[in-house]
């Protein structure tokens, strides 16, 4: 396993001039990046800020099922308030088509906790391909909203390869237009054919 120093060395190597620029985001994805790693992120942020890498945007791609540790919340709020760090939770809650049980996947109390981070820019992203998926997305949004979670909602077409993606891209765009959702393309599919490291 890489050390925090080695991870930040690698991040710095990938950045122009070793710094975040032009609103570049540090996006932490997974698996589930909030599962078991919350204790490591304060050291990661400290190392990035100690190196003066100009980080202003941090995004966690999460399924919205992991409670934030209180110490980690405090650290995120400190960086948000003292350093202007914009924290985003891209919440891709799993709908029944993914095989997840509703009561395990749609957890408004946990997501509402994410929204306590100072100046957060969070949103939902539901991966859909059928009318039933859209019905489930509506149901999930209603459940979150009834718990006070009112954040933007994106729909993203299913498909890691062009042949599948092209089948439902237009359909999902139409769902968005007709239902007031935002459309999120899988830009890596048409551009890079979802090749490794894209």
Per-region residue spans from a language model:
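Conserved AdoMet/S-adenosylmethionine-binding subsite of the radical SAM
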Residues: 34-198
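Conserved alpha-helical substructure of the radical SAM core
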Residues: 1-27
